[in-house]
């Protein structure tokens, strides 16, 4: 049996925070505002994984009202959700994702993101797609006020 899930996340860019996307530190003058490290790509992947199994979303499982998640590394959350899907007898077939940002340019960082995420999720490079898009100067992302990501996750019952 196959299950598919769609994940999405957006965070505001602010001064005084590191920019972490896909578990990789990105050189930029601003970072993403959030209760955790605000890693939009990992959050989108997590929501896609949870959605594929019709489970609660990331905000319900890791509420921003819980101090134990304050500034937490999103890779810790991803590992928890990965272990959850494995415990339910599922494995990842593939993940297709987009990072949407006007700035900074993501392409130089994507190979490192893929390596990091593939290692964490026990998948091969050909099972994970990370693409970089812009908003052509439109909306909050296009005006460099935010960064968003989406991900489609396909799971298979083992």
Residues of each region from the PLM?
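RNase III-family endoribonuclease catalytic core
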Residues: 2-111
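Short beta-strand segments
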Residues: 7, 129-133, 154
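Short, conserved loop-to-beta-strand elements that form functional interface hotspots
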Residues: 96-101, 109-141
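A glycine- and small-aliphatic-rich helix-loop capping segment at beta-alpha/alpha-beta transitions
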Residues: 18, 116, 144-148
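Short, surface-exposed, polar/charged, turn-prone segments marking secondary-structure boundaries
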Residues: 32, 48-49, 121-127, 156-158
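C-terminal edge-of-domain segments
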Residues: 141-158
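Mid-sequence acidic-hydrophobic segments that form the walls
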Residues: 84, 116, 120, 154
């Amino acid at each position: 049996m196959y299950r598919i899930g769609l994940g999405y996340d957006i965070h505001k860019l602010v001064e005084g925070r590191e920019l972490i996307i896909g578990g990789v530190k990105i050189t930029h003058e601003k970072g993403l505002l959030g209760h955790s490290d605000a890693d939009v790509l990992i959050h989108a992947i997590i929501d896609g994984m949870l959605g594929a199994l019709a489970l609660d979303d990331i905000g319900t499982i890791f509420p921003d009202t819980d101090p134990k998640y304050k500034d937490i590394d999103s890779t810790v959350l991803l590992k928890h959700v990965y272990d959850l899907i494995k415990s339910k007898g599922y494995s990842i077939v593939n993940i297709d994702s987009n990072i949407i940002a006007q700035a900074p340019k993501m392409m130089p960082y994507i190979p490192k993101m893929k390596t990091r995420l593939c290692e964490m999720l026990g998948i091969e490079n050909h099972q994970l797609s990370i693409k970089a898009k812009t908003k052509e100067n439109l909306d909050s992302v296009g005006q460099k006020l935010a960064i968003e990501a989406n991900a489609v996750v396909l799971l298979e019952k083992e």
